[in-house]
């Protein structure tokens, strides 16, 4: 399937090549855990605000606004070429998007702007409303399908959780994409090549992996996070595919990983995520073979893996991972 574009593409100095290189991955099966909001937040925690004046230089062409380990704040990327700039994720709602725009102005003077999202969850996507009107939005078709099918419900559910979230998401308006791609898009920002790659369902159905070729920097979204337990938020998350995708991310040979949440790190973040998920998968298979129910398995693993990973945050997601692998186990 080729790209879908509108007239705004004619204004760009960016060269876009769409590559149908990777086979689509099958959908997650039915009878799944209940949909829940990712990266828990309650009123006792800091409000999920993108940090101002904290932007770091990750590599020659890449900057990141770190999340400060605040739930529902993503790591945000700014990739600067000689002709155009690509922004990766936007924070929750227009207020956070305005912060991103101010930080962007400190590191790039380009007026040609592109925006992509690692996945559809509100803290990654809804800040784009505050971006300049000429910003070109690009994302995978699989991700847009999730936006259309799920995002209104996610925004509503987030808004009901705390006063902070309700205020941030008030009057949020969807920003439709200008470019959709099926499996891969390649962007030339001017001396900087960026690959946007959809590999199939993992954390969500539409996870978008962004690789800055010259700098060896990989933005993984929530497919890889640093010292947070991996999040299985709804019926489209797939443990089996997630493990396969981690293997494929290794093939990029990244030097630096900008995870969806948590500190920027090196390629070892991929192997750490893999080690955890494989351990959960293996233990689930063992307990299911012993006749344990899904709920019994989830509660046993919650205790076991909290003890094994005492410095990882949001342990409530252990049970959801266990239930996912239980469904997938033969």
Specify the residue positions occupied by each region the protein language model found:
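Bacterial N-terminal signal peptides that target proteins for export
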Residues: 2-16
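Zn-dependent metallo-beta-lactamase
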Residues: 16-22, 26-83
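Accessory terminal helices/loops
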Residues: 22, 28-45, 251-253, 264-330
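Metallo-beta-lactamase
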Residues: 50, 57, 84-86, 90-94, 145-279, ...
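Conserved beta-strand hairpin/beta-sheet module of binuclear metal-dependent hydrolase folds
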Residues: 55-103, 208-222
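Divalent metal-coordination and catalytic microenvironments
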Residues: 61, 79, 89, 104, ...
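Active-site metal-binding motif and surrounding structural segment of the metallo-beta-lactamase
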Residues: 82-86, 94-139
């Amino acid at each position: 399937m080729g790209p879908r574009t509108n007239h705004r593409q004619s204004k760009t100095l960016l060269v876009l090549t769409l590559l149908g290189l990777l086979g689509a991955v099958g959908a997650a099966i039915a009878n799944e855990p209940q949909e829940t909001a990712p990266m828990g937040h309650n009123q006792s925690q800091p409000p999920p605000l993108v940090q101002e004046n904290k932007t770091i230089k990750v590599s020659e062409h890449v900057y990141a606004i770190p999340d400060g380990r605040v739930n529902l704040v993503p790591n945000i990327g700014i990739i600067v070429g000689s002709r155009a700039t690509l922004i990766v994720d936007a924070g929750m709602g227009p207020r956070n998007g305005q912060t991103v725009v101010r930080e962007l102005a400190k590191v790039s003077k380009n007026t040609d702007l592109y925006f992509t999202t690692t996945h559809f969850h509100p803290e990654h996507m809804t800040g784009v409303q505050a971006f300049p009107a000429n910003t070109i939005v690009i994302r995978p078709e699989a991700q847009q399908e999730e936006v259309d099918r799920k995002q209104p419900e996610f925004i509503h559910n987030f808004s009901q959780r705390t006063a902070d979230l309700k205020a941030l998401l008030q009057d949020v308006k969807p920003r439709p994409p200008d470019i959709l791609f099926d499996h891969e898009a390649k962007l030339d920002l001017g001396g900087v090549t960026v690959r946007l790659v959809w590999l199939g369902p993992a954390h969500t159905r539409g996870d978008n992996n962004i690789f800055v070729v010259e700098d060896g920097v990989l933005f993984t979204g929530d497919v890889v996070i640093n010292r947070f337990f991996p999040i299985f938020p709804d019926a489209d998350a797939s443990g089996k595919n997630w493990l396969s995708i981690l293997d494929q991310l290794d093939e990029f040979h990244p030097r630096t990983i900008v995870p969806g949440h948590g500190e920027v790190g090196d390629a070892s973040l991929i192997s750490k995520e893999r080690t955890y998920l494989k351990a959960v998968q293996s233990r689930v298979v063992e307990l299911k073979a012993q006749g344990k129910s899904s709920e019994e398995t989830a509660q046993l693993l919650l205790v076991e893996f909290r003890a094994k990973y005492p410095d990882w945050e949001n342990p409530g997601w252990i049970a959801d991972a266990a239930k996912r692998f239980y469904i997938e186990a033969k």
